[in-house]
Structures are given as C-alpha cells and as structure tokens.
Amino acid sequence: MNRQRLLAVILIAIMIPLSGCVSDGIDGAQGEQGPQGLPGINGTNGMDGIDGFDGINGTDGQDGMDGQNGINGKSAMISTFDVLPGIHCENGGIGILVGIDENGNGMLTSNEVQETTFVCNGIDGVDNSNSSVSGSTSNGLLNAVSKLGYSDGCPAGGKVMMFGLDNGDNGGIANNGLLESGEIDEQTTYCSTQRISRVTDIAPDALNSNPGGPIVNGYVGMQIVVDDTLYFSADDGIHGTELWAYDMTTDTTRMVADIYPGSNASYPGYWLVLEYEDVIYFDASDPTYGRELWAHNTVDGSTWLVANLNENQYGSNPGDDIEIVYGDTLYFSAFTIDYATEMWAHRPANNSTWLVEDIHHGSSSNPGWFMHFVYEEVLYFSARDMMNVHDLWAHNQSNGTTWKVASFGMAPWTNPGNYFEYLVGDVLYFDADNDLNGRELMAYNLQTNTHWVVEDIVPGQTSSNPGIHFSLLVGDIIYFDTDEQYLYAHSTSNHSTWMVHEFTGATPQNSVKPVVVGSEFFIKLEDGNANLELWVHNTENHSTWMVQSFTAPPSTSTLDIGTIEVVNEILYFDAITEDYGRELWAYNPLDGSTWLIANIHKADAAAGTPDGSSWPGFSLSLVHNGYYFFSATDNAYGVELWKMWFEHTVTYD
C-alpha cells in the first residue's frame, strides 16, 4: 500500500468516533438517574460566640398581703393528786400530771395528760431510843396544795404546790406530818388572770349588731355552740337580723345565711333552736312562707327550709310551746289552719314531717306549754283537750300512741308546771292549782300513777305560788321562793318542807336564773329601790346574805335584766354603780372578794360624756370551754360580741 493510502486510512479511523460531535444529529433519550452518593463528612463546628452583657435588674414587685395571725399558743399545766399505798407507791405519796391545756379552761383534764410521775413516801424509820415520837417517819417528804384567789393576786383563780421535808426547819416541828412554812423547800405557783376583747365589729362603726338579740317583742335571740363554733343572731346593718357564726378555732366571723333577703330580718331562733347530728334546727321568717322550720348543716354549710306547715304568709311559729329532741325525732308545737296549735314531729333520717296528735279538736292544745320531759323513753307534756284544762299527757315514739296520763284539777287555771317541774327518780315535782289548795307544790309518781299536795304552804284556797320567781334542785333538795317573799326548801329524801329565809324588803327576779357553786347557790334580788343585788345561800350552814351592795345612780331602774355565769368556780355578773354604770363584775366565793372586770363603756373625753353602761350579757351570755362570750356596748362600736378568756402563769420558787 502506498504512503498516501495509508495516511487516508489512519485519518478515517480517527474521525469516526468524532463524527457524533461534529454532526448535528438528534439527542438521544435521557438515561435513568443514578443512585445518590454517600453523605459527605460533617464539617468542623464553629467556635462559640462571646456572651452578651447582663441586662439591668427589674424593679421589686409590691409586697404581698399579711397572712392571718397564728393561733394563740396553749399553756402547759401540772396537777397533783394523792396516791394511796399500792402498786405505784408502796407507802403512798403524790402523783404529778403534766400536759397541755388544749381547751383553755385552766384545768388539766384526763385527755390532756401527757405524762404522769409519782413521788412516793419513804418507809417508816426504825424507832430511836432518843426519839420522843415513836414510830414516826424520819424527815419524810411532804406536800401541800392551797387555792389562790383575787386577794392572793390571782383574779381568775390559781393554786400553789409546796414541797419540803418534815425536818422542823426554821422553827417548825420535825416529824409531825405537817408541812410548816419554815419547812417548805420548793413551791410552784399557778396563777390565772381574766382578759377581755371585742370579737369583731359586725355592724360598722357605732351601729349595733345586737348579737343574740335584739331583745324586742319577746325575741330573746339565738345562741348555740356546735363543735367550737358559736351560732347567733345578729344585724350587720345591711341584711337585718340573720344567722351568724363565730369560729373559735380560726377566730373568724361570718354570716351563715340571709334567709329574709334585703334589709328585712328573719329573726332566726325566735321560738326554736335544736341541734341534732351536726344540724341546727330553728324557726325563721321569709317573705314567701312566713315563720317556719329551717335547718343549717354545720358540716357542709347548707341552709334550707325543712317544712312549710301553714300554707300562708304568716307561718306556723314552730316551737312556740315545746321543742325537744326525743330519740331520732324532733318534736315541736306548730300552728296550722286545720289543727290550730298541736304537736308535730320531724324525722331527719327520711326528711318526714307529720302531725303527732290532734288533742284539742277545733282549737289549740298548746302541748308542752307548761312542762315537758322524757321518762323511760316516753315523752310527757302538758296539754289541754276539749275540757279546756291542762293535764299531763304522754306520747310513745315506738308505737306512736298518745294518751292522757293524769289530771290535777278541773279549772282552766290548773296549769301544772306553770313555774317549775323537777323529775327526781320516779316522782315528778311541780306547782299546780287543784281548786282546793290554790297553787301549791305537788308531786306525781309515774310508777304508781298517784299524785298529792306536797305542802299546803298557805292554807286554804289561797296560793303560795311556789317558784314564782325562781327555783332550783341542789342534790335531793328543791329550793323555791313564794308569793310572800320567802325562800322554801323540800327534801325529796325525807319529804320534809321548811322555810329557809325571809327576804325582807327584797324580791327575787325571774329574769336571772340561779347558779350553783359548790355548796352555795346565787340569785339576784331587787332591793326595794329598783336595784338588783347578788345574794347567796349556803346549803350546808343554811345562811343567806347579800354579797355586796352596789349603789346605783339616782332614778336608775335595773329590773328584769342581768346575768350570772360561772367559770372555774368564779361568778361573773353585771352590776351598776355611780362610777362606772352597768359593767361586768366578778365574785370569788373562795375569799369573798368582789371586783370590776373591765370598764368597757368608758367616758368619751372628746364629747365630754361620762362613763356609760356596757350592759354585759344583756342579749347574749354563754360559757364554752373556759371562754365567756357576751354582748356589750362601747362608745366606738355599739353593741357587739365580746369574749373573756384567761392567761396562765407558772412561777417556780
């Protein structure tokens, strides 16, 4: 092959692969996408930036509201008792109880004791031939306890516990069994003082809330304690007189319910106030039903109408004559158009209410108006039937029967229990007018169904009116006054009756119930000058005397008012004087001392008015767990709820 042909062949071979690039042919179809490649390696993190500057602090927020005050602390207490020879002390001694006064009554009760310690007497020493006292204990440990009163610097009472050896120190006599003053080595003094304060200001400023009142038109107000809460009527100046509550644990006061809306008053508890299984039952008035039976649950706070017995706006006045819890049922009188005033019943378990018995057809039997009581699971009560005479009736809850038990006279004024009744064993003692003897002391034996005149104090048909102002049962003796201003007594044991005292120029008052402290009872008498004074009778030595004469301002009448309460054997009562007006006073039978507790209604210097009267306990007076709650008025707050409590101090010498 010549050289030119060879070059042409080589040139053609080179040009053949390039023919697609240099030619302008149509593109071929795109091939499928290949699989994704593996991720690349992460790059290196960058360096952190420089921190910014701190911002300026914000302004402080406003302070929060103060929390409620904490509950007052409780006092530690010690009490002692004699220990007879036995398991704790072979030769006897004293026991020492230590605990916290949880209920604040100034006394250590069994459930408050946390520790008990015994200090035992030593054994008798061996007789010494040189001793003048044979068989005596050699310098034994002795103890003595003395009560303290106002004159000892303990206005609310106290006691001193003394310990020492019977060694004759400081001029004493050794081994005589008496702890003499010179032998006292140690002593502990417990002393209590009264403190009073206003609980709250329910009605703003000087308006009167009248707790437990007001005392108008026969309304004496409502006051009852359930589980350390005091329930009472009061008027805040906005809602009228309604039901209020004071919680003694949290020291707070609240209105329970506004039963009569607006400024009108429901006057709760006008006739009836009963408590059953944490529910308070009471009468109250509203614009729809009038005065009917209501209830308040002290646990869940609910209040509701129990029953609308009289289908008109005036209501049924439940409890006008009788109110009592008998078994699991409330029994009370009520007025209806169909039956007039008869006995009704309400059973909370099934919320049922029914008429017990229509005793006086077409009119009112007024059940329980004069007396009612439960004896051997039967309810006894006074009532009148068609003869219009009040007799003794009975109702048995178990079988639902009602019957007349006994009649004591034929006149409409027989009225058994008009002034008092006392059940002693199987015998009922009461006053009644039997037509022959006038109104005298009578008795009825519920077992033998017999009755008799106990004593015809004023012979003939003239009445002595036993208990016309006051009466009380002390032990087995009934004390009562008579129309002629005598104090009488009747022993239910030996059946004797005698005149105890003649109140010359003084008249007992039925507005203040007598109280008993130890062997003495206290009453209030009008001294002939319209002044009420405190009197006392000792049932052991049979003496009667006036505690103290209080000089009242001229032209001041104090009749049918007043109160007497007892806390830890000390009497608290109202008295009026020229210096202070009517204020709260105290009397301690231990040392016979009388003193002013507080001048609550002080003079207003700005107005130039003298001391007024605070009228303590006028509308509310109640003692609970060592506290005394009472109504009182002052210049700044009007009539409000007050309380008295006690501070205790312990001194070791």
Regions found by a protein language model. Give the residues of each.
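Short, functionally important structural connectors and interaction interfaces within domains
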Residues: A8-A13, N105, M222, N449
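Cysteine-centered, disulfide-bonded loop motifs in secreted/extracellular proteins
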Residues: M15-I16, C89, C154, L243, ...
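Terminal disorder- and signal-encoded targeting elements
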Residues: M1-Q33, N42-G43, I202
